């Protein structure tokens, strides 16, 4: 049974604050193990990768090879069911089109003083995409991570994916082909992150690593950050649904369970202004759980971290939503557009009863790599801007230097940086005391 909170209860603020700080992940202290793996890969390169892959994934690179061949990708595409391949193509087309609208433009201009200023955008040289294996091997995530990089103009996109026994989900390889990724290695874990960051005899290093993974992958990303950039450290998935009584309870229950089935640590929250509707949704959740293939996972998520929050009116719902800062926010009310301007903290907003969050997971076009664990308060979902860099541009002529130089000299000397001051003064023939 999910937790039940009522805005009008005297204990609500205390209970809600406690709810916000509920820990949904079991912390594993894997830093020492990960550091040893990273150091080993840096020291032994391919040999270390071969050893770890044999130990953890049962792979013999002398048989399978480390790199996935183009022929293997071709075969994978033929192995994917036609309806799945068609759906991946629909998703890829929409994701690429939407992300093209995110491309920033250079802005070079001259101000009233005649000083040239501006910003220039360039793609990152090389990006590494980590794709989880096993039950978390999602081809849709390949598209979501790789296509924005392709749109940004990243010239080299590398994919690593753990391959138990050497095999990789064919749909994952098909998605890679659709996204233009051809450099793929069957490695995973902290060792794959280390290889991407520092390089080996076979794998050239990249400049940034993106993609989710387990505790070892997350720890490795943290440890290599600074040598390379990273996207984010993703936590369990979450959804907040704000819904009125005019919704079908089964629809809302299905949306809640769509998140709950991801992980026992996932979180699904309903905010409603109608207690009877909240009851109906809870009953619908219990009913639908009986037929879900991943019922055990979804039930644990709903039991341990789910919530139904009753508010007297939806004016109270929006401030609560901003405090929760959910990864996904569904607005299933009579006038959802009226709420949108007041929503400040959400990874993605899904507007109206006919916009289930799942459409955003796959074929909507927006990205499903979003900030979790309340990090939407200060960060954004993955997009083209994650794969480009902004360089500032500045140009002065002699006239502009004469105008601005004295102020620069004064500020430099006020900070005790005489060499800074002289760098300008020498151009103005002011001497050391100028």
Swiss-Prot record:
Pathway: Amino-acid biosynthesis; L-histidine biosynthesis; L-histidine from 5-phospho-alpha-D-ribose 1-diphosphate: step 9/9. Zn(2+) binds at residues 259, 262, 361, 420. PROSITE patterns: HISOL_DEHYDROGENASE (PS00611). Its cofactor is Zn(2+). The active site is at 327 (proton acceptor), 328 (proton acceptor). One of its GO terms (biological process) is L-histidine biosynthetic process. Binds 1 zinc ion per subunit. Keywords: Amino-acid biosynthesis, Histidine biosynthesis, Metal-binding, NAD, Oxidoreductase, Zinc. One of its GO terms (cellular component) is cytosol. Its EC number is 1.1.1.23. Substrate binds at residues 237, 259, 262, 328, 361, 415, 420. It catalyses: L-histidinol + 2 NAD(+) + H2O = L-histidine + 2 NADH + 3 H(+). NAD(+) binds at residues 130, 191, 214. GO terms for molecular function: histidinol dehydrogenase activity; NAD binding; zinc ion binding. Pfam families: Histidinol_dh (PF00815). Belongs to the histidinol dehydrogenase family. NCBIfam families: hisD. This is Histidinol dehydrogenase. It comes from Rhizobium meliloti (strain 1021). The lineage of its organism: Bacteria, Pseudomonadati, Pseudomonadota, Alphaproteobacteria, Hyphomicrobiales.
């Amino acid at each position: 049974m999910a937790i039940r909170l009522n805005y009008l209860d005297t204990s609500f603020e205390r209970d809600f604050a406690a709810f916000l700080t509920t820990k949904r992940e079991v912390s594993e202290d894997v830093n020492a193990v990960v550091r040893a793996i990273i150091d080993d890969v840096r020291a032994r390169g391919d040999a270390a990768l071969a050893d770890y892959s044999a130990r953890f994934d049962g792979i013999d690179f002398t048989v399978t090879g480390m790199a996935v061949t183009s022929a293997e990708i071709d075969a994978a595409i033929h192995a994917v069911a036609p309806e799945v391949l068609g759906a991946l193509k629909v998703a890829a087309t929409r994701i690429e089109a939407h992300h093209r609208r995110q491309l920033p433009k250079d802005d070079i201009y001259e101000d009233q003083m005649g000083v040239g200023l501006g910003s220039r955008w360039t793609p990152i040289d090389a990006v590494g995409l980590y794709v989880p294996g096993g039950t978390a091997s999602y081809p849709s995530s390949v598209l979501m991570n790789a296509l924005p990089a392709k749109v940004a103009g990243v010239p080299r996109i590398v994919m690593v994916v753990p391959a138990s026994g050497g095999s990789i989900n064919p749909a994952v390889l098909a998605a890679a082909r659709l996204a233009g990724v051809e450099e793929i290695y069957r490695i995973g874990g902290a060792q794959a992150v280390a290889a991407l960051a520092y390089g080996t005899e076979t794998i050239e290093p990249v400049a940034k690593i993106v993609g989710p993974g387990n505790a070892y992958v997350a720890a490795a990303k943290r440890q290599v950050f600074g040598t390379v950039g990273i996207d984010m450290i993703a936590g369990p998935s979450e959804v907040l649904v704000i819904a009125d009584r005019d919704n079908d309870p089964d629809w809302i229950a299905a949306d809640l369970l769509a998140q709950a089935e991801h992980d026992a640590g996932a979180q699904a929250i309903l905010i409603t202004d109608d207690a009877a509707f909240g009851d109906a949704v809870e009953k619908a959740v219990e009913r639908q759980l009986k037929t879900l293939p991943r019922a055990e996972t979804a039930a644990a998520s709903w039991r341990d971290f789910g919530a139904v929050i009753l508010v007297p009116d939806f004016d109270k719902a929006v401030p609560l939503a901003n405090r929760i800062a959910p990864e996904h926010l569904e607005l299933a009310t009579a006038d959802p557009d009226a709420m949108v301007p007041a929503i400040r903290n959400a990874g993605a907003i899904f507007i109206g009863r006919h916009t289930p969050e799942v459409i955003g997971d796959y074929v909507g076009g927006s990205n499903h790599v979003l900030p979790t664990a309340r990090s939407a308060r200060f960060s954004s979902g993955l997009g083209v801007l994650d794969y480009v860099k902004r360089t500032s541009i500045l140009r002065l002529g002699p006239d502009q230097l004469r105008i601005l130089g004295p102020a620069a000299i004064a500020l430099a000397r006020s900070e005790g940086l005489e060499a800074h001051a002289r760098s300008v003064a020498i151009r103005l023939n002011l001497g050391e005391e100028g």
